Amino acid sequence: MRVEPITDEQAAAIAEWRYEFPYEWYDTSADPRRVELFANPARRTHLRAVVDDGDELVGFFNFVPEGHEVRLGLGMRPDLTGRGLAQPFIAAGLDYARREWRPRTFRLWVARWNERALRAYRRAGFHEVGRSEESRFVEMERSA
């Protein structure tokens, strides 16, 4: 898998992704901020596509570099979730961020109920460092 600048076509495709219950919360249309991110090229500064060896879109990363840290937002194409691709997908994004920004740490937030994602992030070396006030989200980090 490789990470590359996102095209308008890829951003439009991601905006159309629909996840099955209970993951529909991750549909782009479920959050106006995500709609704006994918619809507005000016907002895509750190948004990148992840493609496979056949140039098929696998997912995306939204990188937010801040000092010695890179915050991550990411998503995988719905039909590819649960198929054992999480580790190479996450590794591709982390490798890209290391080359681009040389961070000391990576940080992300995940819905507390999303056990599948929590397992994947733990396997990728992330550990819990906090929870949001409402405890809906788990904050995770790992060293770069």
Language model: regions and residue ranges:
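Conserved beta-strand segments that form the floor/walls of ligand-binding pockets within enzyme
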Residues: 71, 75, 107-109, 139
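Conserved acetyl-CoA pyrophosphate-binding loop and the N-cap/start of the following alpha-helix
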Residues: 80, 84-93
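Terminal substrate-recognition subdomain of acyl/acetyltransferases
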Residues: 137-144
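Extreme N-terminal starter segment of soluble prokaryotic enzymes
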Residues: 1-2
